[in-house]
Amino acid sequence: MAQKTLLIITDGIGYRKDSDYNAFFHAKKPTYDLMFKTLPYSLIDTHGLSVGLPKGQMGNSEVGHMCIGAGRVLYQDLVKISLSLQNDGLKNNTAFLSAIQKSSVVHLMGLMSDGGVHSHIEHFIALALECEKFHKKVYLHLITDGRDVAPKSALTYLEIMQNICNESIQIATMSGRFYAMDRDNRFERIKLAYNSLMGLTDPTPLSPSEYIQSQYDKNITDEFIMPTCFKNYCGMQDDESFIFINFRNDRAREITSALGQKEFNGFKRQVFKKLHIATMTPYDKNFPYPILFPKESIQNTLAEVVSECNLTQSHIAETEKYAHVTFFINGGVETPFKNENRVLIQSPKVTTYDLKPEMSAKEVTLAVLEQMRLGTDLIIVNFANGDMVGHTGNFEASVKAVEAVDTSLGEILSLAKELNYAMLLTSDHGNCEHMKDENQNPLTNHTAGSVYCFVLGNGIKSIKNGALNNIASSVLKLMGIKAPATMDEPLF
């Protein structure tokens, strides 16, 4: 079966049964029509738990390409942490146990919402209750959201947090994310949040719910709630433990630096306490703190396996998707593997891609044809049109985008047959197959559905339905290479 192989990723072109405002359905696509008649094809899942995202959540290019390249499901932080907590994972979590065993007092801080972008309130609650089992005094430092969730939803989340409060668990401070989660070195904001954590802010006489309402009365929404501390809280003390429950790192670094770094230049701290700090995920490579959920090292990716076989490979895309067919598909590895060639085609310089829906598909295609004629063993290519034009919400332009991709596929398929190349064609997620909602409003987001997968290969008569984690092993099988045990089964 061993053949030189093409892996083609048609970004943003998905499957949808309904034809209304389905750019893929309405496009003139003779190459796709030919493939439907002559090649085995199936449907591939690209969203939700099948790619390591929360149930029902739409896929994206970063996660999609990581999953394709790894050949297995890589659970994203939100899902990985939630699954661990549901299975009592904290019982054996050395970073968590180390942090809480060093003090009778544990401070927990995090974004109080279920937005799932930076944190999740369920994680907040799980850690607080686990600390309570160890007979700790737990202080909650609540960061109000209003950005990833409704602008005035804090009272709803506060009620959930208050349900676990008792003599052991107490709400100590509150701050809008504008202050506690700055990421732009505006340390005057961080200072206000820091001072409340240290008990340097005059405590409000109001209860947490009254305080939120008082901010609303001043037309201040959740994101911008002024940092404060509540009565009976005296600030952090030396040798107490602190765990930041946010799993996204960019907006967690500054306040963590202020709390933990002895050498800190953001602002002059009136008080600096020696805390036993732990973070939910890696926030900064220079932070020395224990990490509850370390980053997973992704090894034995498709590109790595091919490289170890001393075969050649070329990764080709235009600017908009270049990182996806290099860094992301290689498991977060920036440096090319041995015998890995990379081709970057410049995306057109237009304000929005509906002005040029063909984008740089022609130039990308020429690069693919050149690599095929050179006999490159594996060619990975991304066509960005379906996604980037789909994001504009322009249905007519999205139809043209699909047609441009179809033209490119026709040229590649023709040469593949001539040169005996195998081919696997799929998408990282959908987009352009659903361009308007039931009220005729433009849809610009990815879809949470399936995508097509076509295979051209010697002796391949049928392929199974699957998910993106089945792609890498399928490509390796076409190439006659044994897939590593870390990869999931192929589609045929």
Curated annotation (Swiss-Prot):
Cofactor binding remark: Binds 2 manganese ions per subunit.
* Co-factor requirement: Mn(2+)
Tell me, what is one Gene Ontology molecular-function annotation carried by this entry?
Answer: manganese ion binding
- Which biological process terms from the Gene Ontology are attached to this UniProt entry? glucose catabolic process; glycolytic process
Q: Which InterPro entries match?
A: Alkaline_phosphatase_core_sf, BPG-indep_PGM_N, Metalloenzyme, PGAM_B_sf, Pgm_bpd_ind
Give residues annotated as binding Mn(2+) 1.
D387, H391, H446
Active site residues of this protein: S61
Residues bound to substrate are H118, R147, D148, R177, R183, R248, N249, D250, R251, K321
Q: What is its EC number?
A: 5.4.2.12
The pathway it acts in is:
Carbohydrate degradation; glycolysis; pyruvate from D-glyceraldehyde 3-phosphate: step 3/5
To which protein family does this belong? Belongs to the BPG-independent phosphoglycerate mutase family.
| Protein name per the record | 2,3-bisphosphoglycerate-independent phosphoglycerate mutase
Organism (species):
Helicobacter acinonychis (strain Sheeba)
